[in-house]
Structures are given as C-alpha cells and as structure tokens.
UniProtKB/Swiss-Prot annotation:
Family label: Belongs to the venom CUB family.
Source species of the chain: Triatoma infestans
Gene Ontology biological process terms from the UniProt entry: innate immune response
Name the record gives this protein: Triatox
Expression sites by tissue: Expressed by the venom gland.
Cellular compartments per GO CC: extracellular region
Miscellaneous note of the record: Predicted to be an amphipathic alpha-helix.
Alphabetical keyword list: Antimicrobial, Disulfide bond, Immunity, Innate immunity, Secreted, Signal
Compartment(s) where it occurs, according to its Swiss-Prot or TrEMBL record: Secreted
Main location: secreted
Amino acid sequence: MTTLRVLLAVCCAAYCILAEDVTVPANGELKLMPDQKAGGRLEGQWKISTPDHYYLIVSCGLWSSASGTCKDKILITQGGKTTEVCGEGKNSFYVQQDTNLNTAEIIILTNTPDARAMCTVYSAEKPKEENTF
C-alpha cells in the first residue's frame, strides 16, 4: 500500500499543475504567460481575484498549427462556467466579462511546440446601482 501511495504521489507531481494565486489590483491589469516545458509545451494555471466592488475582464489569445483538434487550449472558468478556447491551426481570441464576477481561473495547456498563448486580465470598477424611487 505504501508503494502505491508513493507511486501515486510521483505521478501527480509529474502531471499536476499547481495553480498560482494572483490578485489584479483595482483598475489594474495583469499579463499571464505560461511556463515553457520540455519539447516546447506551454503550461500555466492561475486563480485570479480582484477586490470587491470590482470585476474581471479576461482577454486571451492562442495560436497553434495543430488543426482539427484541441491539443492546444485555454480553459477559462468564471461563475461555475468553463469556456474552452482551442488553437486549431489559427489565431483564436476570447474576451469575457461579467460585472458580477471578481474571480476567475485560467489554465493554458499546449502540446504543439510552436503554440503561443497568453492572457491579460483587467480589473474594472462595478457600475454604480442607481436608486429608483
């Protein structure tokens, strides 16, 4: 049983990506660049937040020569909904904003050596609620 636990821990360490917690300052921006791994693969995972009374605008771009598959992808999770952005042999861009959400998680995983990916996350002040009398 102990050998199995050690083997499982080694496998998890080899294949799991640990998310980096980052905070976007109020009215600020943050560029997210994945780490380059062996064979040119890119990997990155971030848990992002901004202060209360602010929301996140997520903007990601991915280019990959791998067409017809989703070998290279960006996963963007906000408010319990995950969006998958695939390279598929072209430039793929994605912008998401929800004025109710001040957290997000982004995962970038590529298997094609020439793939390029990055995200920029902006913090914006939530709109003021108008009093309706």
